[in-house]
Structure formats: C-alpha cells, structure tokens
C-alpha cells in the first residue's frame, strides 16, 4: 500500500530529524547553524503537510502541533524549530481564511470589545474541507523556504549602509551572518575588526581566521580586554541565537559584557538577526532559556584537588536586555528593539505562542 509506505517514510524522517536535534544539542559549542535548522524544520513540515492524513486545516494544525511539541522537546534551547512551526501554523490559518474568502488580518486586529465578548477563534472554524488547501499550503511553505535561503544575503546587502571607511568594528565569537555582513562591506570599504575570542569555546579565533583570509584587518582579544579596548571602537556588530519577545537577546556567552561596555562608552550596538530568530519566548522561561555544557574547558579534570571543593557551571548563553541594543538588522530591514512586538504579531498568530 503506497499510503502506508508514505507514512512509514514520514515517521522515519521525523525520527531522524529528532536524533539530529538531540545530537546537535550535546555538542561542545553553541554554533549549530540556525539557518540549516530552520530550513530542515520547514522542509520536514512541508513533507508532513504533503504526506500525512488530514482532511481539514484543523486536522493538519493538530498534527503539526503534536509533532512540533516532540521536536521542541528534543532540543528546547534551539528556538528556531518552534519559530518555524509557528510560521507554518500561521500559513495554514492564512490559506484557510483565503479559501473561505475571509481575511486573516481582520481576525487578528479584532477590537478589545470583540475579544472580551467572543471566545476568540475556535478550532471549529478550521473544520471545513477545501480540496485545494493542501496544494496552497505547500506552495506557501515553498515561498517560506525561498525566503529562508536568502536571509543571510539580504542582511549582508545592507552592510554598506552601516559600515564606513576606517571604522573600528568589534564583534564576539563567530556568527555566520555577521561574517557575511563584514565580508560584504569589505568589498568596498577598508576597516578594522576586533574579535573577542569568546572563551571557553573560542569561536572568535575561527571568525578572525575567516575574516583575515578575506583581506580584512583583524585583531583577536581576550574577553577580559573588551572594556579596555571599547573606547577605540566605532560600532559593535553581533549575531544572536534568539531574539526574544521583549526585544532582548539570548546570545553567546560574553555578549552581555560586550553590550554593557558598549553602553558605557555610548558605542552603537547592532544585531544582525534574520526573522526566523524572532521568538515569542520571554527571558523568564527558565527551563528553555538556559543551557549548560561541560566545564572541562574552564576547569580541566586534571585539577583534581580543586574539583572536589567547587561546583563549576558553564552556561552557553547570555541574556542581553533590549535597552542595551541600538538596532536590529533583519532580512527585511533595520528595526529598533521597541518594534519587535509588531514584527512578532506579523509572523505568528497569538494562539500559536504556546504550542
């Protein structure tokens, strides 16, 4: 039976992706390509839409929520997975509304009176069957995948608006988006990049090697020297793992130190973050916010005498509050941290914030 074969194939692909997520999370450093994770998640959701058994938008949303909860549980710190699931749920809502001939925008911008008097959009609204819905949803997911393919390039294209000749730029660790951003600017501008090494993972060394290979004047500094060097810096440009609902960041360890130093010296702090990193999560959600790894890089196991007397924690991420950030550069342009809530409402439906 071809239907049964499809279901077995789909289950195998979901399980393979789950094990990939788990393995990625147990790595030594925080650098797992978020853009690859976003594309893989979206491609898997497209396959679920195409191959799973469902007859209405409500059924499909229930399947995607169920599988989504499993994917998020496999690696809670990888917020990109949850973000793409919410984007696809929004797509399904929009395509269903289009099939019915109504506008999803009207539903989202309901007045306060309507929200209080009605129970909101119930799942009953998604039970109507439309023959073309599957094809329409798949087409919309394909458009999302195309958008994801070009996110880094779209951010890099804006580099010349922000980086000027003979500037001193500081960054921390290694972000592929920031790397592409700086390399794009280097085609027409001469500038100097200072990279904080980002111990204990020391991804900054890889970043510096990559930039110097591209002909950019680069200096690596220890994390402890950030404040001392900041007075000479014109701009700080960083990447992030997640942009939170309040406009804050969950970024690689050491970013908060950098942001505080930049604030003290009134140095602009620019964050390069594609739209798929926007998450409806808040910094008080402790269980998914923090991620700790083995501290053997900080305190080797050979230090036997000290090891028995201390507890060592090695967090992967820092929280950076929105008041320390000057500007976000996403694949659709530049935004102030206070504008994040608006982007969030455009990307995700309020009912999908909790899967």
Curated annotation (Swiss-Prot):
Pfam families: IF-2B (PF01008)
GO CC list: cytoplasm; cytosol; eukaryotic translation initiation factor 2B complex
Localization per record: Cytoplasm, Cytosol
Coiled-coil blocks: none
Function: Acts as a component of the translation initiation factor 2B (eIF2B) complex, which catalyzes the exchange of GDP for GTP on eukaryotic initiation factor 2 (eIF2) gamma subunit. Its guanine nucleotide exchange factor activity is repressed when bound to eIF2 complex phosphorylated on the alpha subunit, thereby limiting the amount of methionyl-initiator methionine tRNA available to the ribosome and consequently global translation is repressed.
Family of the protein in this entry: Belongs to the eIF-2B alpha/beta/delta subunits family.
Assembly notes: Component of the translation initiation factor 2B (eIF2B) complex which is a heterodecamer of two sets of five different subunits: alpha, beta, gamma, delta and epsilon. Subunits alpha, beta and delta comprise a regulatory subcomplex and subunits epsilon and gamma comprise a catalytic subcomplex. Within the complex, the hexameric regulatory complex resides at the center, with the two heterodimeric catalytic subcomplexes bound on opposite sides.
Protein's name according to its UniProt entry: Translation initiation factor eIF2B subunit beta
